[in-house]
């Protein structure tokens, strides 16, 4: 995913009639099924004279990307991304994340199949905001953010798979390729309850695969457009990583251990002020329509947003190094990732990844925190 699998799987949820939280599971099941109901095979959209030429071009591009994913990245060849759904809304789901005032550790929610993760997804934005408000009332910092895509991990291929969605079909070529590669990567493997491992792995697949697509298949214009887009993203992620580290230092400081919360609040404010000042400097250097792409994220930044972002970044260098170690051979890479994924604990998986790649993973958000969400 480019987003995590933000809803529990519809097929499983329909079996949960005895759960205390039946209302939530029902909205998850009915929300996903509502997407499947409006999805139509891509050829039907292409044959419809009422469909605009730009949308047809994007759908054709998405089919090329899907074929590339299967042929060049050894990703699953199934029903996913062979249909398209126009949702008439800006997001597939809205994720809620929450964290304490002095920690980047996200609150966990537990679901069938997905395990315990640091987010809760809603198909209705108002419901997501209500959940965030409920968590705020408990003293947590919260965030609600739109998710353009999620994966059903291959469980819904019998029902047509995961469709292309209007929420991301208009993305620039390189980004469209990355989101398809990311979501298909989740169908290769998924470790219940370890969102940092899952999202870092899928992000590594999308980055490596996206670079391959751009080099081999994209036009010079598409490569140039993507270079500008990704350059800004990498600068922002680097700044956010430094800020996560700074915040963790604050929350692990002597003042925090002594319970001097006035001092901790002052240090936290200083770290956030520095983040926003440095972002303003970065933004002033950027050009083009995406100059203000992160403005809202920065304005709302808190422990929850920083904690969520860590899931997509923290272990990526290890997976990229593992791919290089396996001679850039996708089947060998997936086999080794499966071996590591089969280890029983998060700590063992992190240690195995470090040993396999010779890298010491240094990150700001304590990988065992089950962080989740859609990275910036």
Residue ranges and their predicted role:
Residues 35, 48, 55-62, 121-128, ...:
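Solvent-exposed, acidic/flexible segments
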Residues 36-53, 109-117, 299-301, 317:
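Acidic/histidine-rich, surface-exposed loop or edge segments in extracytoplasmic proteins
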Residues 15-18:
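C-terminal motif of bacterial Sec signal peptides marking the signal peptidase cleavage site
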Residues 20-23:
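Bacterial signal peptide processing site
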Residues 1-8:
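Bacterial N-terminal signal peptides that target proteins for export
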Residues 241-365, 372-376:
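Pan-zinc metallopeptidase signature
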Residues 29-69:
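Amphipathic alpha-helical packing elements
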Residues 65-233, 248:
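Acidic/His-rich structured neighborhood in mature extracellular/periplasmic domains
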């Amino acid at each position: 995913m480019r987003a995590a699998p933000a809803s529990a799987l519809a097929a499983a949820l329909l079996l949960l009639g005895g759960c205390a939280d039946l209302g939530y599971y029902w909205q998850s099941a009915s929300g996903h099924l509502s997407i499947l109901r409006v999805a139509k095979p891509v050829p039907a959209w292409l044959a419809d004279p009422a469909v605009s030429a730009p949308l047809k071009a994007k759908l054709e591009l998405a089919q090329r990307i899907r074929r590339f994913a299967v042929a060049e990245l050894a990703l699953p060849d199934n029903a996913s991304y062979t249909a398209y759904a126009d949702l008439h809304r800006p997001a597939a789901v809205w994720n809620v994340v929450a964290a304490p005032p002095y920690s980047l550790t996200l609150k966990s929610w537990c679901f069938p199949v997905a395990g315990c993760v640091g987010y809760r997804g809603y198909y209705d934005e108002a419901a997501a905001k209500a959940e965030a408000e409920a968590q705020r009332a408990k003293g947590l910092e919260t965030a609600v953010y739109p998710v353009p895509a999620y994966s059903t991990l291959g469980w819904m291929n019998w029902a047509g798979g995961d469709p292309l969605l209007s929420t991301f079909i208009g993305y620039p070529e390189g980004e469209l390729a990355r989101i398809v590669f990311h979501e298909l990567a989740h169908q290769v493997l998924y470790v219940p309850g370890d969102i940092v491992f899952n999202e870092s792995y899928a992000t590594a697949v999308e980055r490596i695969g996206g670079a391959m697509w751009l080099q081999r298949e994209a036009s010079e214009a598409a490569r140039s457009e993507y270079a500008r887009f990704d350059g800004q993203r990498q600068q922002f992620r680097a700044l956010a990583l430094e800020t996560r580290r700074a915040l963790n230092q604050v929350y692990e400081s002597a003042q925090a251990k002594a319970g001097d919360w006035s001092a901790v609040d002052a240090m936290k404010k200083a770290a956030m002020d520095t983040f926003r000042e440095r972002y303003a400097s970065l933004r002033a250097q950027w050009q083009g329509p995406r100059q203000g792409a992160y403005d809202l994220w920065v304005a709302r930044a808190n422990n929850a947003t920083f904690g969520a972002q860590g899931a997509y970044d923290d272990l990526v260098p290890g997976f990229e190094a593992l791919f290089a170690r396996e001679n850039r051979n996708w089947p060998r890479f997936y086999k080794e990732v499966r071996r590591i994924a089969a280890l029983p604990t998060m700590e063992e998986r992190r240690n195995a990844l470090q040993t396999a790649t010779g890298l010491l993973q240094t990150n700001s958000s304590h990988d065992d925190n089950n962080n989740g969400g859609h990275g910036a």
